[in-house]
Amino acid sequence: MTSASSMSVSVECVNICNLTKGDGNARSDCSALSCAWKAPRALTGFLASTAHPPVCSVYSCGRNGRKSRMKACAWQRYEYEVGFSEAPYFVNVRNILKSRLSCGGHKRWELYCVSAESSSGASSDVTVETLWEDLFPSISYLPRKELEFVQKGLKLAFEAHHGQKRRSGEPFIIHPVAVARILGELELDWESIVAGLLHDTVEDTNFITFEKIEEEFGATVRHIVEGETKVSKLGKLKCKTESETIQDVKADDLRQMFLAMTDEVRVIIVKLADRLHNMRTLCHMPPHKQSSIAGETLQVFAPLAKLLGMYSIKSELENLSFMYVSAEDYDRVTSRIANLYKEHEKELTEANRILVKKIEDDQFLDLVTVNTDVRSVCKETYSIYKAALKSKGSINDYNQIAQLRIVVKPKPSVGVGPLCSPQQICYHVLGLVHEIWKPIPRTVKDYIATPKPNGYQSLHTTVIPFLYESMFRLEVQIRTEEMDLIAERGIAVYYNGKSLSTGLVGNAVPLGRNSRGKTGCLNNADFALRVGWLNAIREWQEEFVGNMSSREFVDTITRDLLGSRVFVFTPKGEIKNLPKGATVVDYAYLIHTEIGNKMVAAKVNGNLVSPTHVLENAEVVEIVTYNALSSKSAFQRHKQWLQHAKTRSARHKIMRFLREQAAQCAAEITQDQVNDFVADSDSDVEDLTEDSRKSLQWWEKILVNVKQFQSQDKSRDTTPAPQNGSVWAPKVNGKHNKAIKNSSSDEPEFLLPGDGIARILPANIPAYKEVLPGLDSWRDSKIATWHHLEGQSIEWLCVVSMDRKGIIAEVTTVLAAEGIALCSCVAEIDRGRGLAVMLFQIEANIESLVSVCAKVDLVLGVLGWSSGCSWPRSTENAQVLEC
C-alpha cells in the first residue's frame, strides 16, 4: 500500500527556443520537439495543464546594460513542492514573483524567458525519425503490426504538411503529432491515432484524398478523418449572403460536428484531442480570438468531454478556457487555493497518515486486495469557481479544496473466490473511513450503485477530520482501479488499444471495426448507456429538420445536453438526465412524444404532482396518460404547459402538437384561441384556418342554438318558450366557445326542460364511462335522494378525476371563484382504479355553468365532467352537459 503526500509540479518550456535565465546565460533545456506538444502542461500524461495567465506582464532581466524583455503570457517554468498528488496545480506567474521569491525550504521556482524568434531555424531539426522517437513512448502499448500502421501514417502526414507553419512559427507537423500523442496517452486504438495524425491532411493539402486514406488504412480511419474534415472545413467558410452572420456559419459548423459524432464516436475523441492542443498553444492567437475560442471550448467541448466521461481532458479544457475567459477570477481562485493549502497543509498530511495507517492495519483488505493507494488531490480551479458561484458567496468564503482519493486494486477473482466483489471492497473501505471520522449529513453519495449517465462510479463522503480543533472539511473518494481508469478516460476506454470490444448501439451509433475483438472495461451494453444521448441528437435532427435553424439546433444541444443536469429515475429504475430546472413536461417528451401529448398528470416518488413540477435529483417519475382526452382540453392544457417546458426540444414538440390540434379540431376551440396561438407561435394564420375550413366547415358550427335552462320552476309549462329565430350562445371570457346541441337530432334546436339530452360536443365517448360503467346509476341514485329531501328541480355537476389528495378542494375553489352556489356534495373513490367521482348540487345559470366547466376541465387530474338539471317526475330525462 502506498501513499503520496507530496509532488513536484513543473511547467516546461513550450516553444522552440533557447531559454534565458535571469543572469542572461543561455540555456537549451528543451528541444524543438519535446516542448512543442507539451505546451503548456504543468504535468505529463493526461493531467497536463498550463500555468500561464492570458494577461501579459512585462519583466526585465539581464546584465551589462542589456535587457531581455519577457512576457508572462509566454510559457514559464517553475517548480513548487505541494501536497496534492497527481493534480494540476495552477499558480499565476505574478503571484509566484510576489510571494514565492521569499519562500524557502522545499519551495523553489525557476522562471525562464520564452521566445518564438528562434523557431525559424528549428525546421531542420524536425524529421520523421525524430518525430517517431518522441511519439513512440506514448503509443508503445500497441502491437508491432499496428505500430507499423502508425509509423506509415506519420510519414504520410509529414509529407502532406511539409513546409507548412503554425502561427507560432513552428512546423505544422508538430500539431498532428501532438494530437496523436494525446490520444496515445489515453491508450486509444491505432485507428484513432492514425486519424489524429491525418485529421488535417485532406483539408489543408491537395496531396491526400479520402480514397487514398481508405486504401492505405481502411474505411474506419477514413470515416474518422472525413468526420473531422467536415467539422473543421465549415468554420473557414465566409458568409454567402448578407443575411448570414458569422454566428450562423459557426452554428452550422457545430451542427455538422454534432451530426458527425452520431455516426462515429471517435470523431468526438479526436476532435477533443485537437481542441486540447489548440488550447495549450492559444497564446499565439490574437486576444479577441483567444476569448472567442476559449468561450466556445467552455460552452461546447468541455461539456462534451464530461458527457463522455473523459474528466482528465474536461478538467484541462475548463481550466485553460477559464484563464482566457475570466483572467481576474482565475487569479482570485488560484490565490485562494494557495492560501487554503498553506492554511490546511498540516491537517491534510495528518489525515492522510491516519487513513493510510487504518487501511494498512485492516486484515480484510490485506486478504482481498493487491494494494490500496491513497492520493491527496486538489479540486479543479474551474470547479471551485462554479461551486462558489452556485453558493452565491465570495470565493474567499469557499474553503473546501482538498480531497483524499482511495484507489483499490482487488486481487483477481481466482485468488479471492466468491468472498466479495470489487464493489463490496469499496463499501468496506467506506466503513473504515466512517469509523475514523463521522460523515457530514447528506454528503454521502453512492455512484457505484447508481452510476452517472456517463458511467462515472465512485463513493463520495465528506468528513471533518479534526472536529474539535478545526472545521477543515475533507472529501474522500473511494473507487477501484478500473473505476478510476474509466473516470479519467471515459468512453475512450472502449476503444483501448490493448483490448477492444465493438458492436452497435441500437440502430443508431455504429462503432467501427474491431481489430482483435477482445473485451475491455466496457462492454456493448455499458457503451450504449454512455452514448445514448447521441441518439437524441440524431432524433432531433430527423424530427425538426426544416423547422429548426442551425443556431437553434446548436442552442438546443448546448442547453439541453451540455448544461447542468439533474438525474431522475423511471419506474423501472432507468436513469434519465435532463437540464437543471427541467419539469415533468420535459421528462414526458424525453420518454416519447406521444407520452407527452397524452399526459394528464404525473407521480413523483409516488405522489401526484403537476406536470409543471420542477424535477430534483434522484426523484422517481411516472407519467399518467389518458387516451380519451378531448382535443379542446388537450389544446388548453398544452398551451399552458408550453411556458413551463425548459428544454427547447419539448417546446418544439408542444408547438407542433398545438398546431395539429388547432388545424384538425377547430370546432372545439374558438377561432380567437387559435388566432392567439398562431400569433404567439409566428405561424401563418391563413394556412391554419384553410385546413380548419376543409375539415370542419369553418366556425359557424361552433355557434348553435341552445336553451338557457333554469331551475326556478318545477314544471316546464311555466318555462317560457323561445321566440322563433332567437339565438343564444354561451360565452367564456367574452368569447363564444361552446357548442350545445340536441344529441337526438342532427340539426340544432331549442331544448325544453325534460326533453332529450343537451351536451357539449365531445371528441369521442369519454373513456371513464367504460372504466366506471355504473357511474350513471350511482349519479341518478344520489340525485334521487336530493329530490326526496327537497322535492324540486336539481342542478348538478359531476366530475371524474384521478384520485389525488386535495383535488376536491381545488374543484370547489374553482366553483366558488365563479360564483357557483354549492348546496350539497358527495364523493366516491375507486382506489383499485385510482379514480374519484364528485357530485355537486349547484345553483347557476347556463353561462356561469359553461364557464366554470371549462375551468374545472383544466384542474390537474380531472378526466371529464357532466352537468344537468333534473326534475322529480322525469329524472331519467334530465338535461346533461358532458365533456
Curated annotation (Swiss-Prot):
Subcellular localization, as worded in the UniProt entry? Plastid, Chloroplast
- Segments of skewed composition (Polar residues): 710-726
Query: Which EC numbers characterise this protein's activity in its record?
Result: 2.7.6.5
**Reaction equations catalysed:** GTP + ATP = guanosine 3'-diphosphate 5'-triphosphate + AMP
Mind telling me which Pfam families this protein's record contains? HD_4, RelA_SpoT, TGS
Task: Please list the residue ranges annotated as the TGS domain.
Answer: 562-625
Q: Does the keyword Zinc apply?
A: no
What Gene Ontology molecular function terms does this protein carry?
A: ATP binding; GTP binding; GTP diphosphokinase activity; kinase activity
Offer a single GO CC term for the protein. Answer: chloroplast
Q: Which keywords appear in this protein's UniProt record, sorted alphabetically?
A: ATP-binding, Chloroplast, GTP-binding, Kinase, Nucleotide-binding, Plastid, Stress response, Transferase, Transit peptide
Extract the InterPro entries matched here: ACT-like_dom_sf (IPR045865), Beta-grasp_dom_sf (IPR012675), HD/PDEase_dom (IPR003607), HD_domain (IPR006674), NT_sf (IPR043519), RelA_SpoT (IPR007685), TGS (IPR004095), TGS-like (IPR012676)
What is stated as this protein's family in its record?
Belongs to the RelA/SpoT family.
Assembly, per entry = Interacts with RPP5.
Instruction: Specify the protein name.
Output: Putative GTP diphosphokinase RSH1, chloroplastic
